[in-house]
Amino acid sequence: MKATLVLFLLAQVSWAGPFEQRGLFDFMLEDEASGIIPYDPDNPLISMCPYRCQCHLRVVQCSDLGLDKVPWEFPPDTTLLDLQNNKITEIKEGAFKNLKDLHTLILVNNKISKISPEAFKPLVKLERLYLSKNHLKELPEKLPKTLQELRLHDNEITKLKKSVFNGLNRMIVIELGGNPLKNSGIENGALQGMKGLGYIRISDTNITAIPQGLPTSISELHLDGNKIAKVDAASLKGMSNLSKLGLSFNSITVVENGSLANVPHLRELHLDNNKLLRVPAGLAQHKYVQVVYLHNNNISEVGQHDFCLPSYQTRKTSYTAVSLYSNPVRYWQIHPHTFRCVFGRSTIQLGNYK
């Protein structure tokens, strides 16, 4: 009888199929046979895991499930909620009730066009909110004051209101690229309410000038792929903490005299793929600029003192990368002493004009 039982069990094992991964967390679990956590009436937190979602270590993953609305209940100790790549169209009030410990909310690549003003009210610890690739026409009202990172690129946003950002003093990163924004739709000083903001990206929009009234705390400003035609000194006034300025792929023809003096701590200047006719004034006097990208412009002449001071005194910080290739100027037309303050031959990229 025992022999028969053993043979039966062996047969059951031999009929079992190979391991098949069902979810992201399968290889993280030690006690479960799959990433699907079973219903457990004795553990209310596990039992609250939404159907077809995966819950583990305070992380709830409900991505790529074809959901058309937010599931009605989550474990209350959830810290990260992933709802990306679904078909959610609206975030209603109460959608995230009781999620007082939530730190990260991912709603990328849905069809969200409407968010209730009270939708995020329960999220008193939310730090990161990702709403990119949706159909939002305006920013949600009453954002949590605890937010540190907000990403809203590739939506349909046309206006930035000052009232939306007031009081968001913990915000560090904001991404607004890929929206049909125009300068007329950006309220003057709209972003000034974020006193600790360090990084802004407003790329691939319809803006024609650097937005006015940006927070003075910014260290990185990315405005690539817009329709900016000119950099004037006033637009950079007060930006004393700016270390990286990205203005590639615009239509800039001139950088006004005195502009670089307003950004005394600038280290990287990206002005490639524009319509510049000359090297921006003020580079030689700037103490900290290390990287200057000027390739793919219309620069036909490089002056002997455009990059270095007239004397042979060394700069406080040396250039590490200067690109001038794909400009009308020929390398043999540039005076041999033009880059006298640069150390390292590989630092300068001249190339040929095509």
UniProtKB/Swiss-Prot annotation:
- What Gene Ontology biological process does one annotation of this record name? negative regulation of angiogenesis
Superkingdom as given in the UniProt entry: Eukaryota
Alphabetically list the UniProt keywords.
Disulfide bond, Extracellular matrix, Glycoprotein, Leucine-rich repeat, Proteoglycan, Repeat, Secreted, Signal
The post-translation modification note in this UniProt entry reads: The attached glycosaminoglycan chain can be either chondroitin sulfate or dermatan sulfate depending upon the tissue of origin.
Spell out where the chain crosses the membrane: none
Where it sits in the cell: the answer is: Secreted, Extracellular space, Extracellular matrix; Secreted
Question: Any S-S bridges, and between which cysteines?
Answer: 49-55, 53-62, 308-341
LRR repeats, residue ranges:
68-88, 89-112, 113-136, 137-157, 158-181, 182-207, 208-228, 229-252, 253-276, 277-299, 300-329, 330-354
- Database matches in Pfam families: LRR_8, LRRNT
- InterPro entries xref list: Leu-rich_rpt, Leu-rich_rpt_typical-subtyp, LRR_dom_sf, LRRNT, SLRP, SLRP_I_decor/aspor/byglycan
Single annotated GO MF: glycosaminoglycan binding
Which positions carry the propeptide annotation?
Answer: 17-30
Q: GO cellular component annotations, sorted alphabetically?
A: collagen type VI trimer; extracellular space
Q: Which residues form the signal peptide?
A: 1-16
Query: What is annotated about its quaternary structure and interactions?
Result: Binds to type I and type II collagen, fibronectin and TGF-beta. Forms a ternary complex with MFAP2 and ELN. Interacts with DPT.
General function of this protein: May affect the rate of fibrils formation. May be implicated in the dilatation of the rat cervix.
Family recorded in the similarity comment: Belongs to the small leucine-rich proteoglycan (SLRP) family. SLRP class I subfamily.
Query: What is the name listed in the Swiss-Prot or TrEMBL entry for this protein?
Result: Decorin
Q: What is the lineage of its organism?
A: Eukaryota, Metazoa, Chordata, Craniata, Vertebrata
The record's gene field reads: Dcn
